[in-house]
Amino acid sequence: MSKFLVKAPAKINLFLHILGKNNNYHSLESLLVFVNIYDILEVTIDAPRSGVYFTNLKINRYNNTITKVIYLLSQHSTSSVNVFVSVIKNILVSAGLAGGSADAAAVMRLLGNVWDIQPQVLEELALEIGSDVPACLHSKTLFARGRGEDILLLPDLCLPKYIVIVAPKGKPLSTVKVFNNYEPSAFSSPICDNLPVRQDDWLELIYNARNDLLDTALKFVPEIEEILFVLRKFRNCLIARMTGSGATCFALFNELSDAEVVVRELQMTRPDWIVFNAKIL
């Protein structure tokens, strides 16, 4: 029996464009970053039994992204044994931060290494778990397109580092619900053939981009609009935007001190919001 402790970082979509829909899946383009907010997973390999335990949330223990990973990878390994995972959830659930996908990817990386499963196989299996899982396998700044499987890593992209994250308390938002109700008058045009090369061009793209799911999310959580309005008023806020399918929003800053001012003020004045700062990895 072997025990491992792994961390699963939260994801932020700096922008998210929807290009169309094929075979019931939306095609997208998104710039993703990962931040220093982590779920902590204790993974026991060759445990007395397989299973998943969430220490502080009522998440289905028998049908979740981690159980799916354990099952899928066991089918691709001759050395598979019982795996038990205990999860401390720090990433907000149903909030657009890819917590479930991050957990799945963390377990996938570990088991892939221990069971000697090739990275290409892991990437193919990741998409079966969820559209964010391939990106979470990397957990680095990247540009994703298609269903999320077409990934371009951007190791040299230097972005503003400090993020204030704000979510309305008690208002989870289902990704499936948002996508199922997404009915645009027109889809976004692709940018993948004209990706920026220079640093300044990437920053300009980020500033001028958007989250195409915002209007749909607002139908279910109108408070998102107020959060964005408040964030945009703060000094030196570069952008304020919703991440993923919501309802979490973020504001981007160059300086930690500016982000800390926002967090202090909102934690004092908005007890109805969850507010914390983070840093891009």
UniProtKB/Swiss-Prot annotation:
Function in brief: Catalyzes the phosphorylation of the position 2 hydroxy group of 4-diphosphocytidyl-2C-methyl-D-erythritol.
SUPFAM superfamilies to which the protein is assigned, alphabetical: GHMP Kinase, C-terminal domain, Ribosomal protein S5 domain 2-like
EC number: 2.7.1.148
Entry similarity comment: Belongs to the GHMP kinase family. IspE subfamily.
PANTHER family found in the cross-reference section: 4-DIPHOSPHOCYTIDYL-2-C-METHYL-D-ERYTHRITOL KINASE, CHLOROPLASTIC
Pfam family, one: GHMP_kinases_N
Designated name of the protein: 4-diphosphocytidyl-2-C-methyl-D-erythritol kinase
Organism of this sequence: Ehrlichia ruminantium (strain Gardel)
Keywords, comma-separated and alphabetical: ATP-binding, Isoprene biosynthesis, Kinase, Nucleotide-binding, Transferase
UniProt-annotated catalytic positions: K11, D132
UniProt catalytic activity: 4-CDP-2-C-methyl-D-erythritol + ATP = 4-CDP-2-C-methyl-D-erythritol 2-phosphate + ADP + H(+)
Positions of ATP binding: L92, V93, S94, A95, G96, L97, A98, G99, G100, S101, A102
Cited InterPro entries: GHMP_kinase_C_dom, GHMP_kinase_C_sf, GHMP_kinase_N_dom, IspE, Ribosomal_Su5_D2-typ_SF, Ribsml_uS5_D2-typ_fold_subgr
GO biological process per UniProt: isopentenyl diphosphate biosynthetic process, methylerythritol 4-phosphate pathway; terpenoid biosynthetic process
